[in-house]
Amino acid sequence: MGTPVEVSKLHFLLFPFMAHGHMIPTLDMAKLFATKGAKSTILTTPLNAKLFFEKPIKSFNQDNPGLEDITIQILNFPCTELGLPDGCENTDFIFSTPDLNVGDLSQKFLLAMKYFEEPLEELLVTMRPDCLVGNMFFPWSTKVAEKFGVPRLVFHGTGYFSLCASHCIRLPKNVATSSEPFVIPDLPGDILITEEQVMETEEESVMGRFMKAIRDSERDSFGVLVNSFYELEQAYSDYFKSFVAKRAWHIGPLSLGNRKFEEKAERGKKASIDEHECLKWLDSKKCDSVIYMAFGTMSSFKNEQLIEIAAGLDMSGHDFVWVVNRKGSQVEKEDWLPEGFEEKTKGKGLIIRGWAPQVLILEHKAIGGFLTHCGWNSLLEGVAAGLPMVTWPVGAEQFYNEKLVTQVLKTGVSVGVKKMMQVVGDFISREKVEGAVREVMVGEERRKRAKELAEMAKNAVKEGGSSDLEVDRLMEELTLVKLQKEKV
């Protein structure tokens, strides 16, 4: 099914939340819409434009002269006037700066997004887009868009499973302790979880009211865009459209839209390691022999835990690539590595301090497993690369994502984390790290399932695939809305 001629006239205004996990797939989405003949404009702040968008957008536009240019619209964000530290334009600032109260500042940062309401109104008047893709953390954007007759699509940055799980979750009254597993009610699959793994907010708290506003704005919106593909979460896609949002389109995996080496290398921030050197190191390794380990941008472990991870990796006997994010003043210190560790594992291990070219690494034939914090972008990149996973969730919806991998897809092994890091956090011993790494690297049935899912992911985004057709359907619906408005 092809897209109608009128689709080329569509103009998408994309407004991502100012965090890696939201900005990166938003850029991928803009590229996707461009390949379908639409124009895309990304709204962001000066710092984020420079860090995340300017270079890859310039490259994309130059490489695709036949497509509508992706453009950037800058919105100023007066941090200090809003009670935030100077330069606090994304969550990376919050999680990488020492001596900050992460919890308080994160909440203040979220609530400060309301500042953009008035500038967005002005832009909708002057730009007259055909659709606003507003991040979930901008609940006020539904009413703003409605005021000007613009359909607002919600983007969460996660998959159907976690969206359904968070909709269904009700903490049971009959469990003895917060660590006792219970089945999530009404959710297909009899999924087990514990109270310690669920992020709950008091209804009358500031965050409780904010989350209610998110749910209400989603209900009143035009629909939801989901970075996933039907074959991955079939039962949960059906459930979501039947009981949660009614209207949703799966358009992923968005990361697979990046086909050129440079696109993959430039995805996100500039890598802290030369990607060619990294791949050269991997080229010297046997197929499926290396475990890749990364915990995302918002996780930072204490030294004691990092020492256990290092020891567990060493004990496993497997070669590894380990991405380590250190916070603030920790960056210069190397007391988190066991004495002589790097010398002992020289040739067997590669430690990347900072940002890694993750998609390039995951796709390399030498990588045989992925130890992940279960952030949705990382998890989906692992699925697209056909990798079995060791799951180490930290917070947010990551425990739900872990259940999808371990209980539904059966392509992962849990390292044994029992509770959220935001609360207290678990301490995982070197023996658990060793055991999980060994198990995931040798399980052939698990690996076979993972490779089958990767093939499904690639087929989903090909012409005529499930996600490709879904994008066409979305375009056609928005085109009809546009044509009806023009008749009035």
Curated annotation (Swiss-Prot):
Indicate whether Transferase appears among the record's keywords. Answer: yes
- Recount the UniProt induction comment for this entry: Not induced by pathogen or salicylic acid.
Keyword terms, alphabetized:
Glycosyltransferase, Transferase
What Enzyme Commission number(s) does the record list for this chain? 2.4.1.-
- Which Pfam families is this protein grouped with? UDPGT
UniProt xrefs under Gene3D superfamilies: Glycogen Phosphorylase B
PROSITE patterns for this protein: UDPGT
Q: What class of enzyme is it?
A: transferase
In Gene Ontology terms, what is one molecular function of this protein? quercetin 7-O-glucosyltransferase activity
Q: Which InterPro entries match?
A: UDP_glucos_trans, UDP_glycos_trans_CS
- Record-listed UDP-alpha-D-glucose binding positions: 297, 356-358, 373-381, 395-398
Q: To which protein family does this belong?
A: Belongs to the UDP-glycosyltransferase family.
Role of this protein: Possesses low quercetin 3-O-glucosyltransferase and 7-O-glucosyltransferase activities in vitro.
Tell me which PANTHER family the record gives: GLYCOSYLTRANSFERASE, SCOPOLETIN GLUCOSYLTRANSFERASE-LIKE
* Name of this chain's protein: UDP-glycosyltransferase 73B1
Source organism (scientific name) = Arabidopsis thaliana
